[in-house]
Every structure is written in C-alpha cells, then in structure tokens.
UniProtKB/Swiss-Prot annotation:
This is Arginine--tRNA ligase. It comes from Histophilus somni (strain 129Pt). The keyword Aminoacyl-tRNA synthetase applies. It is an enzyme of class 6 (ligase). One of its GO terms (cellular component) is cytoplasm. Belongs to the class-I aminoacyl-tRNA synthetase family. Keywords: Aminoacyl-tRNA synthetase, ATP-binding, Cytoplasm, Ligase, Nucleotide-binding, Protein biosynthesis. Pfam families: Arg_tRNA_synt_N, DALR_1, tRNA-synt_1d. GO terms for biological process: arginyl-tRNA aminoacylation. Its EC number is 6.1.1.19.
Length: 577
C-alpha cells in the first residue's frame, strides 16, 4: 500500500471539488516533525494563488470536502495553508495486518513496463577496476527493485567489445597460442593487454599483422571473429567472478556489447544524411545541434562517422536506443554511467529523437553518478597512484571484515563466521556506495563503512539479526501469531507502524528515480524506530499476552522489511553475528 498515493488522490479530489483544475497537485509528503502530523499537504498555497484565493480559506474549503473517514484521526490547517494529517491508529493496525500476510509486503505496481537497464559495461581484455563498481551495484539495485515492483526488466551489459585495439589483441593471442602458451597467462588481462601493446609499438611486422586483422575483423572474417569471441568469453568469465562475489544478478546472457549494433551503423549514418541531419565536414559526417553550443556560440557538431569511415560511440548509442525500442519493445531505457558522459548521452538521444527513431513516449534516462574518491579527496587510487583492481578491493574488504568479526564474534562456528565475514565485507563496500546520493562524489573510507554505528551495512545487518534473536528466544511461530490482533497503544508502536507502511512509497521512488540511497535512508530510519520501540515497549516479558503477540507481529514485519529491503540492494543478511 502507498499511504502517500492514497492521501494525494483523496486531497486532489477535494481540491478539484473546491475549484482547482485537473493538473492540481496536493504535494503530500511525510511530515518532518510529529507536531505537524504524520503527513502534510503542501500544494494548497500554489493552487490558491492560481485561483486568486486566500490560501487558508481555500485550505478550509478543501478540508471540508476531504473524505478521509477512518483513515485520518484528525486534520488541521497550519501556517499559511498547509494541511497536517494525523493517521488513525486503527486504520494503521488493519493495514499492518494485511501487509504482514502479503509476500510482497503490500507493494503493488500500477502499470507493468518493459524496462532496459544498461549498467556495468566493462571493457574486453581489461580487468574490472573500482571505476566499474558504481555502475554495477547501483544499476543492479535498481534492477532488483524494478523486478520486485513487477516490471519486465532486460539487463544490458554494454561491454566495450569492439574497436581498433582488437587487431593487436587477436595478433597477440595468436602468437601465444602458436607458442603453446597456457590460457592461464590470460588470467592477468592487464598484463596481456600491456604485452600486446608493447609488441604493437616495437615490432613493425606484428603491427602490420594487427592492422590487417582490424580490417578482416570488421569485414566479418571467420578466423578473426573466432579469436575475437575467445577474448570476449575469457574476459566475461573473469568478470562473472566479480559479479558473483558482489552478489550482482548479471550473467553472460546479459551481454549486449557495442558489437551488437555494428550492422545498424552504416544504415543509420546513411539515413541521417538522407534526412539532412548529417552533413559532410572535412570528410566526416557531422550532425549540428542548435540545442548545444560550442565555445564560439555556434551549434555544436557531433561526429557520427569519421573521415576514415569509422563510427563513434555516439553512433553506437543512437543504434542502441533504436534497438531497445524497436527490437526489445521497451517502454523505458535507463543508462547508469559517469556524470562526465551526460552531454554525450543527451546529444546521442537528441539525434535519435530528431531522426524519429523512437517516439516521445519512449523514456531515455541517463542515471548519472559521481566519482569514488580517496580520503585525500582525489580519485581513489592505489598507494603508488595506479588503478585499483576490483578483485583487490573485494579481497581487502574480506580481510578487514575477518579482522573485525574475529574481534567481536567469538561464539560463531567456522561456517557461520565465514558467512558473516563475506556478508559484512562485501555488504560494507556496496552499502557505503548505495547509501550516498549517486549524483555526488563520495569518499571511500574503510573505517566508516565497517563501523557498527551509523548508516552502514554492519549496523543494518546487526539490526536484522537482533530481531531474529527475539524469535529465537520464543517458541511462538509465525502461524501462531497470525490470528493475533495488532494494537497500537504506545506512540512508539504507532510511529513504527507508519514507517513500515511507507515501504511501498520508498520502493516506488527508487524504481522511478534510480536512487537506492532513498531505500538505504528508509531502512536506517526503520532500524532506528525499531530500536526505540524495543527499548521502551517490552515484548517477550510483557504480562499482557495480547500486547506481547501484537508487538511480536510488529517485530516480524520489521524483520521481513529489513531483509527484503537489503535484498533489493543486493546485500546479504545473516541469522547470527
């Protein structure tokens, strides 16, 4: 259920009855402070201004027309025209009962869409590094959320599997195979790439062969395609190990690399020329966009085909948008990539729309993110200033979690301890990123992310196990709890109930905006409210059996919500810590 949506619809209906037009917005939001109610309608003043009415008079008119019987305990006008809404505790209790019985915790979807999510996108013949972390884990959290909401999600791992470098890589792979070098030498992809480049720079015979292989590959030569496919497969097998460690849902079946769109590129450039969108400029094919200006204030030129006939990333991204609409039949396409790619994506999509390749109804959304910084505020690097390999980062996360858990948890079996170390280590790296607004840069700090205090993975995982421990101390089963009635007699119970019922509106925001930090903030607030409830409202040692069972049900729904929420983020929970 979505309280915000229920209240918005009811208040908008009253606003229209009071004289507002169809486009009016109630702007209902959860209140920041208890004295302002549980929810507040903030759209009255703007609508009153449009109608030329006194905001408080209009608010009173709306208040008289709102039908919130059995939903709101009371409503009041505050300040210049806000409407404060205090929810009825019996209505809350009834909805907690319903939510607890629903496998999806009351979450529904109004309109199922087919949504393509383009994320991760590493390069072939190179190892994944920390620069791939944000796209991979933010994209995957949004994918999980959209699927939970009932949408048909198509994962698109837009890997860099094409380009002139493949001539040199194929030539070097051939050299290794001719020398009977073990495929194990490809375990270090960075070393393989460096060695290929060194041969290319220093051996003219090798370089000539590499250049020939580029042409052959682009012309579809069977041998070159086979060698190219080997490089792609070896790379993606190694990347899969990172995905599995990160508890990310990508598989090799989700690879939709740049090469997929190659057959479309000549046709797209020819069509752009035919439409008069692309013009020749110094041998290249260029689209000039009035919407973007260069430093001289003239329309910016976007190259779609180079003088030598080669295509660019822009051309590929135009083809990808067209393919996702026409072939994949998507309603919406999200691309998770660095903020520095924002202008590039906007230009590619503007050309796509100008050419009529997709309708206005097709949503193309760049979900950009900032950089991961070191404590010095500079891009995160190794001590020697090199790029941090993703596998090295995850190894260090496990080592640090091992030290942390070994100090704190002495009662765990070796199997339990290993599960906790993995959940905390990997979870800490992911949660530290996911809990930050993706559009901003963030500082990577081991001490903060592995802390059991604050908005961190260890704190959230411990909050979950703490509730599990309550149920481990009682022989009352979930089935036995089922007939018990929810009672919200204490204010802390009521506040916890409201937060539990806000799960859907939170998840809907994540699905719409692609912002997992909203879910992290919600789960952190939920854990805090449960902690306050647990301290002030006795559960197992309560003399009143009805109150005890009611509070156990609140605890059970909190446990389920924390587990489901963390799972949407791709973060594992453990039964004991």
């Amino acid at each position: 259920m979505n309280i915000q949506s229920i209240l918005s619809n009811k208040i908008k209906q009253a606003m229209r009855q009071a004289g507002a037009d169809e486009q009016c917005d109630a702007l209902v939001k959860p209140s920041g402070k208890p004295q302002f109610g549980d929810y507040q309608a903030n759209g009255i003043m703007a609508t009153a201004k449009k109608l030329g009415l006194n905001p408080r008079d209009f608010a009173q008119k709306v208040l008289d027309l709102i039908d919130l019987k059995n939903i709101a305990e009371k409503m009041e006008i505050a300040g210049p025209g806000f409407i404060n809404i205090f929810l009825d505790k019996n209505w809350l209790a009834e909805n907690i009962q319903v939510t607890l019985q629903d496998k999806k915790l009351g979450v529904t979807v109004e309109e199922i869409q087919t949504i393509v999510v383009d994320y991760s996108s590493p390069n072939v013949a190179k190892e994944m590094h920390v620069g791939h972390l944000r796209s991979t884990i933010i994209g995957d959290a949004v994918v999980r959320t959209l699927e939970f909401l009932g949408h048909n999600v198509i994962r698109a791992n837009h890997v860099g599997d094409w380009g002139t470098q493949f001539g040199m890589l194929i030539a070097y792979l051939e050299k290794m195979e001719n020398e009977h070098a073990s495929a194990m030498e490809l375990a270090d992809l960075e070393a393989f790439y460096r060695a290929a480049k060194e041969h290319y720079d220093n051996d003219e015979t090798f370089a000539e062969k590499a250049r020939n292989y580029v042409v052959k590959l682009q012309n579809g030569d069977a041998y070159c395609r086979t060698m190219w496919k080997k490089l792609v497969d070896i790379t993606m097998q190694q990347n899969q190990r990172n995905y599995d460690r990160l508890n990310v849902t990508l598989t090799q079946n989700d690879v939709m690399g740049e090469s997929l769109y190659n057959p479309m590129l000549p046709e797209i450039v020819a069509d752009l020329k035919a439409q008069g969108l692309a013009v020749e400029d110094e041998g290249a094919q260029v689209v000039y966009l009035e919407e973007f200006k260069n430093k001289d204030g003239d329309p910016m030129g976007v190259i779609v085909q180079k003088k030598d006939g080669g295509f660019l990333y822009t051309t590929t991204d135009i083809a990808a948008a067209k393919y996702r609409y026409h072939t994949l039949k998507a309603d919406r396409a999200l691309v998770f990539s660095d903020t520095r790619q924002s202008q590039h994506m906007q230009q590619a999509w503007l050309i796509t729309r100008k050419a009529g390749y997709v309708p206005d109804s097709f949503q193309l959304e760049h979900k950009n993110f900032g950089m991961m910084l070191g404590k010095d505020g500079k891009p995160f690097k190794t001590r020697s200033g090199g790029t941090v390999k993703l596998t090295d980062l995850l190894d260090e996360a496990i080592e640090r979690a091992d030290k942390l858990i070994s100090e704190k948890s002495t009662a765990l079996s070796s199997k339990e301890k290993a599960a906790v170390i993995e959940a905390v280590g990997i979870g800490s790296v992911k949660y530290a990123d996911l809990s930050k607004n993706r559009t901003t840069d963030y500082v990577f700090d081991w001490d903060i992310m592995l802390s059991f205090e604050g908005n961190t993975a260890p704190y959230m995982q411990y909050a979950y196990t703490r509730i599990r421990s309550i149920f481990n101390k009682t022989d009352i089963s979930e089935e036995q709890l089922h007939p018990a009635k929810i009672q919200l007699t204490d204010e802390k119970e009521r506040l916890l109930a409201i937060k539990l019922l806000q799960f859907e509106e939170t998840v809907q925001i994540v699905g719409k905006e692609g912002t997992p930090h909203i879910l992290c903030a919600y789960l952190y607030e939920l854990a805090g409210l449960f902690s306050s409830f647990y301290e002030h409202c006795p559960i197992l040692n309560n003399d009143n059996e009805n109150v005890k069972l009611s509070r156990l049900k609140l605890a059970l729904l909190t446990e389920k919500t924390l587990k489901q929420g963390l799972d949407l983020l791709g973060i594992k929970t453990v039964e004991k810590m």
